[in-house]
Swiss-Prot record:
GO MF term list: transcription coregulator activity
Main localisation: nucleus
Record-given protein name: Mediator of RNA polymerase II transcription subunit 7
Pfam families reported in the protein's UniProt record: Med7 (PF05983)
Function: Component of the Mediator complex, a coactivator involved in the regulated transcription of nearly all RNA polymerase II-dependent genes. Mediator functions as a bridge to convey information from gene-specific regulatory proteins to the basal RNA polymerase II transcription machinery. Mediator is recruited to promoters by direct interactions with regulatory proteins and serves as a scaffold for the assembly of a functional preinitiation complex with RNA polymerase II and the general transcription factors.
InterPro entries, per database record: Med7/Med21-like, Mediatior_Med7, Mediatior_Med7_sf
Region (Disordered): 1-27, 234-276
Amino acid sequence: MADADAQRQAEEDANLQLPPYPHPPPFYLKFTTENKDRLDEIKKEDGIDTASDGGKSAQLSTEQILALPTELRYLIPPEPPADTEEFNVFGTINQLKDRDTFNGTMEYISQALAKLLPDWKYEQLYPTTDASNSASSTLDRQRYLFRFLRSILVAYIELLGIVAINPTDELKDDKLKDILTMVTNMHALINEYRPHQARETLISEMERQVEKKKMEIQGVRKMKERVGEVLEGFGREIPSEKAEDRTEEAAVTSEEERKRDAQRQMWQAMDEMLSQ
Protein backbone atom coordinates (compact mmCIF):
# COMPACT_ATOMS: atom_id res chain seq x y z
CA MET A 1 0.00 0.00 0.00
CA ALA A 2 2.82 2.34 0.89
CA ASP A 3 4.57 1.54 -2.38
CA ALA A 4 1.41 2.34 -4.35
CA ASP A 5 1.01 5.68 -2.54
CA ALA A 6 4.65 6.54 -3.18
CA GLN A 7 4.29 5.65 -6.86
CA ARG A 8 1.14 7.73 -7.18
CA GLN A 9 2.84 10.66 -5.47
CA ALA A 10 5.81 10.35 -7.82
CA GLU A 11 3.48 10.38 -10.84
CA GLU A 12 1.69 13.46 -9.53
CA ASP A 13 5.02 15.23 -9.00
CA ALA A 14 6.10 14.31 -12.51
CA ASN A 15 2.87 15.67 -14.00
CA LEU A 16 3.09 18.85 -11.94
CA GLN A 17 3.76 21.82 -14.21
CA LEU A 18 5.31 24.82 -12.54
CA PRO A 19 4.38 28.23 -13.96
CA PRO A 20 7.20 30.18 -15.62
CA TYR A 21 6.51 33.14 -13.32
CA PRO A 22 5.37 33.13 -9.68
CA HIS A 23 1.73 33.87 -8.99
CA PRO A 24 0.84 37.27 -7.52
CA PRO A 25 0.07 37.38 -3.79
CA PRO A 26 -3.47 36.19 -3.10
CA PHE A 27 -4.57 39.42 -1.44
CA TYR A 28 -4.72 41.17 -4.84
CA LEU A 29 -8.20 39.64 -5.12
CA LYS A 30 -9.32 41.97 -2.32
CA PHE A 31 -8.69 45.06 -4.48
CA THR A 32 -12.20 45.34 -5.88
CA THR A 33 -14.50 48.28 -6.52
CA GLU A 34 -16.92 47.04 -3.88
CA ASN A 35 -14.24 46.90 -1.19
CA LYS A 36 -12.97 50.35 -2.14
CA ASP A 37 -16.49 51.79 -1.85
CA ARG A 38 -16.92 50.12 1.54
CA LEU A 39 -13.63 51.61 2.73
CA ASP A 40 -14.66 55.07 1.53
CA GLU A 41 -17.95 54.77 3.43
CA ILE A 42 -16.12 53.81 6.61
CA LYS A 43 -13.80 56.78 6.18
CA LYS A 44 -16.74 59.13 5.77
CA GLU A 45 -18.35 57.72 8.91
CA ASP A 46 -15.10 58.40 10.78
CA GLY A 47 -14.99 61.96 9.45
CA ILE A 48 -12.17 61.46 6.92
CA ASP A 49 -12.65 63.28 3.63
CA THR A 50 -11.36 60.95 0.89
CA ALA A 51 -11.65 63.66 -1.76
CA SER A 52 -9.28 66.05 0.03
CA ASP A 53 -6.53 63.50 0.72
CA GLY A 54 -6.64 61.92 -2.73
CA GLY A 55 -8.04 58.63 -1.44
CA LYS A 56 -5.05 58.00 0.80
CA SER A 57 -5.51 56.04 4.01
CA ALA A 58 -2.65 57.55 6.00
CA GLN A 59 -5.06 59.46 8.27
CA LEU A 60 -6.57 56.30 9.70
CA SER A 61 -5.28 55.55 13.16
CA THR A 62 -3.96 52.17 14.21
CA GLU A 63 -7.14 51.43 16.16
CA GLN A 64 -9.31 52.28 13.16
CA ILE A 65 -7.25 50.05 10.88
CA LEU A 66 -7.47 47.12 13.30
CA ALA A 67 -11.24 47.59 13.51
CA LEU A 68 -11.63 47.18 9.75
CA PRO A 69 -12.64 43.84 8.22
CA THR A 70 -9.72 41.74 7.06
CA GLU A 71 -10.48 42.18 3.37
CA LEU A 72 -10.40 45.98 3.75
CA ARG A 73 -7.08 46.12 5.57
CA TYR A 74 -5.29 45.03 2.41
CA LEU A 75 -6.44 48.26 0.72
CA ILE A 76 -4.50 50.39 3.19
CA PRO A 77 -0.84 50.73 2.17
CA PRO A 78 1.77 50.37 4.90
CA GLU A 79 3.73 53.32 6.16
CA PRO A 80 6.86 54.02 4.10
CA PRO A 81 10.11 53.05 5.82
CA ALA A 82 12.11 55.74 7.54
CA ASP A 83 15.19 57.18 5.85
CA THR A 84 17.39 55.74 8.58
CA GLU A 85 15.88 52.24 8.43
CA GLU A 86 18.52 49.68 7.48
CA PHE A 87 18.14 46.69 5.17
CA ASN A 88 20.50 43.98 3.97
CA VAL A 89 21.41 43.60 0.28
CA PHE A 90 23.92 40.87 -0.62
CA GLY A 91 25.42 41.01 2.85
CA THR A 92 25.78 44.81 2.85
CA ILE A 93 23.80 47.00 5.24
CA ASN A 94 22.12 49.88 3.41
CA GLN A 95 19.69 52.64 4.20
CA LEU A 96 16.77 54.01 2.23
CA LYS A 97 18.50 57.37 2.14
CA ASP A 98 21.97 57.10 0.67
CA ARG A 99 24.76 57.41 3.15
CA ASP A 100 27.74 59.64 2.63
CA THR A 101 30.01 56.76 1.70
CA PHE A 102 32.98 59.01 0.95
CA ASN A 103 33.08 60.52 4.43
CA GLY A 104 32.62 57.04 5.85
CA THR A 105 35.62 55.87 3.83
CA MET A 106 37.69 58.81 5.08
CA GLU A 107 36.79 57.98 8.67
CA TYR A 108 37.80 54.37 8.08
CA ILE A 109 41.17 55.48 6.66
CA SER A 110 41.69 57.81 9.62
CA GLN A 111 40.99 55.00 12.09
CA ALA A 112 43.14 52.50 10.19
CA LEU A 113 46.11 54.90 10.16
CA ALA A 114 45.60 56.15 13.70
CA LYS A 115 48.85 54.53 14.88
CA LEU A 116 50.96 55.62 11.90
CA LEU A 117 49.46 59.08 11.33
CA PRO A 118 47.66 60.17 14.50
CA ASP A 119 45.23 63.10 14.35
CA TRP A 120 44.89 62.91 10.56
CA LYS A 121 41.53 64.11 9.30
CA TYR A 122 40.29 64.59 5.79
CA GLU A 123 40.25 68.22 4.69
CA GLN A 124 38.66 69.35 1.45
CA LEU A 125 41.11 71.54 -0.46
CA TYR A 126 38.88 72.56 -3.37
CA PRO A 127 35.68 74.63 -3.40
CA THR A 128 32.37 72.87 -3.05
CA THR A 129 30.25 72.75 -6.19
CA ASP A 130 26.79 74.27 -6.05
CA ALA A 131 24.01 73.12 -8.35
CA SER A 132 22.68 76.70 -8.51
CA ASN A 133 25.92 78.03 -9.99
CA SER A 134 25.98 79.00 -13.64
CA ALA A 135 27.94 77.07 -16.25
CA SER A 136 30.67 79.76 -16.29
CA SER A 137 31.38 79.29 -12.59
CA THR A 138 31.49 75.50 -12.71
CA LEU A 139 34.41 73.94 -10.87
CA ASP A 140 37.37 73.16 -13.13
CA ARG A 141 38.17 69.73 -11.73
CA GLN A 142 40.94 69.06 -14.21
CA ARG A 143 42.87 72.14 -13.08
CA TYR A 144 42.62 71.09 -9.43
CA LEU A 145 43.67 67.55 -10.27
CA PHE A 146 46.84 68.84 -11.94
CA ARG A 147 47.49 71.10 -8.96
CA PHE A 148 47.21 68.22 -6.53
CA LEU A 149 49.41 66.04 -8.71
CA ARG A 150 52.19 68.62 -8.84
CA SER A 151 51.87 69.27 -5.11
CA ILE A 152 52.12 65.53 -4.39
CA LEU A 153 55.31 65.28 -6.46
CA VAL A 154 56.86 68.25 -4.64
CA ALA A 155 55.81 66.90 -1.24
CA TYR A 156 57.22 63.48 -2.10
CA ILE A 157 60.60 65.00 -3.03
CA GLU A 158 60.60 66.95 0.23
CA LEU A 159 59.73 63.73 2.09
CA LEU A 160 62.71 61.98 0.52
CA GLY A 161 64.98 64.82 1.64
CA ILE A 162 63.67 64.62 5.21
CA VAL A 163 64.04 60.85 5.40
CA ALA A 164 67.55 61.02 3.92
CA ILE A 165 68.69 63.39 6.67
CA ASN A 166 66.76 62.01 9.65
CA PRO A 167 64.33 59.08 9.20
CA THR A 168 62.81 59.70 12.65
CA ASP A 169 62.10 63.38 12.11
CA GLU A 170 58.53 64.42 12.99
CA LEU A 171 58.35 66.45 9.80
CA LYS A 172 58.14 63.11 7.99
CA ASP A 173 54.71 62.45 9.46
CA ASP A 174 53.52 65.93 8.53
CA LYS A 175 54.55 65.39 4.92
CA LEU A 176 52.83 62.01 4.85
CA LYS A 177 49.64 63.62 6.16
CA ASP A 178 49.85 66.30 3.47
CA ILE A 179 50.34 63.70 0.75
CA LEU A 180 47.44 61.60 2.06
CA THR A 181 45.18 64.65 2.18
CA MET A 182 45.97 65.57 -1.42
CA VAL A 183 45.53 61.98 -2.61
CA THR A 184 42.10 61.74 -0.97
CA ASN A 185 41.12 65.08 -2.53
CA MET A 186 42.10 63.73 -5.94
CA HIS A 187 40.03 60.64 -5.19
CA ALA A 188 37.03 62.81 -4.31
CA LEU A 189 37.37 64.86 -7.51
CA ILE A 190 37.67 61.74 -9.64
CA ASN A 191 34.50 60.36 -8.04
CA GLU A 192 32.65 63.47 -9.22
CA TYR A 193 33.35 62.34 -12.77
CA ARG A 194 31.24 59.19 -12.25
CA PRO A 195 28.01 60.66 -13.68
CA HIS A 196 29.94 61.92 -16.71
CA GLN A 197 31.55 58.49 -17.10
CA ALA A 198 28.17 56.75 -16.90
CA ARG A 199 26.70 59.16 -19.48
CA GLU A 200 29.60 58.68 -21.89
CA THR A 201 29.43 54.91 -21.42
CA LEU A 202 25.73 54.96 -22.28
CA ILE A 203 26.37 57.12 -25.35
CA SER A 204 29.14 54.78 -26.50
CA GLU A 205 26.92 51.72 -26.04
CA MET A 206 24.05 53.33 -27.94
CA GLU A 207 26.39 54.31 -30.79
CA ARG A 208 27.69 50.76 -30.91
CA GLN A 209 24.15 49.40 -31.15
CA VAL A 210 23.32 51.88 -33.93
CA GLU A 211 26.38 50.78 -35.92
CA LYS A 212 25.43 47.15 -35.37
CA LYS A 213 21.89 47.80 -36.65
CA LYS A 214 23.28 49.61 -39.68
CA MET A 215 25.52 46.64 -40.49
CA GLU A 216 22.56 44.28 -40.12
CA ILE A 217 20.47 46.45 -42.44
CA GLN A 218 23.31 46.52 -44.96
CA GLY A 219 23.57 42.74 -44.79
CA VAL A 220 19.82 42.37 -45.36
CA ARG A 221 20.03 44.66 -48.38
CA LYS A 222 22.89 42.63 -49.84
CA MET A 223 20.91 39.42 -49.31
CA LYS A 224 17.90 41.05 -50.97
CA GLU A 225 20.00 41.97 -54.01
CA ARG A 226 21.46 38.48 -54.16
CA VAL A 227 18.03 36.84 -53.95
CA GLY A 228 16.76 39.22 -56.63
CA GLU A 229 19.60 38.23 -58.93
CA VAL A 230 18.90 34.54 -58.35
CA LEU A 231 15.18 34.97 -59.01
CA GLU A 232 15.94 37.00 -62.12
CA GLY A 233 18.16 34.19 -63.33
CA PHE A 234 15.34 31.73 -62.74
CA GLY A 235 13.06 33.91 -64.86
CA ARG A 236 15.49 33.93 -67.74
CA GLU A 237 15.69 30.14 -67.66
CA ILE A 238 11.93 29.59 -68.02
CA PRO A 239 11.31 27.90 -71.39
CA SER A 240 9.49 29.96 -74.01
CA GLU A 241 6.44 28.90 -75.96
CA LYS A 242 8.59 28.48 -79.09
CA ALA A 243 9.88 25.12 -77.82
CA GLU A 244 6.67 23.32 -78.84
CA ASP A 245 8.51 21.47 -81.59
CA ARG A 246 10.49 19.47 -79.06
CA THR A 247 9.38 16.01 -78.21
CA GLU A 248 7.51 15.46 -74.99
CA GLU A 249 10.24 13.24 -73.54
CA ALA A 250 12.99 15.76 -74.28
CA ALA A 251 10.89 18.56 -72.79
CA VAL A 252 10.32 16.62 -69.56
CA THR A 253 14.02 15.77 -69.31
CA SER A 254 15.13 19.35 -69.89
CA GLU A 255 12.54 20.62 -67.38
CA GLU A 256 13.86 18.29 -64.68
CA GLU A 257 17.42 19.37 -65.40
CA ARG A 258 16.43 23.01 -65.14
CA LYS A 259 14.72 22.33 -61.81
CA ARG A 260 17.85 20.63 -60.49
CA ASP A 261 20.02 23.50 -61.70
CA ALA A 262 17.65 26.00 -60.12
CA GLN A 263 17.70 24.10 -56.82
CA ARG A 264 21.50 23.94 -56.88
CA GLN A 265 21.73 27.66 -57.54
CA MET A 266 19.25 28.38 -54.77
CA TRP A 267 21.22 26.31 -52.24
CA GLN A 268 24.43 27.97 -53.39
CA ALA A 269 22.88 31.40 -52.92
CA MET A 270 21.62 30.43 -49.44
CA ASP A 271 25.10 29.21 -48.49
CA GLU A 272 26.61 32.49 -49.64
CA MET A 273 24.04 34.53 -47.70
CA LEU A 274 24.43 32.52 -44.49
CA SER A 275 28.21 32.64 -44.69
CA GLN A 276 28.22 36.44 -44.66
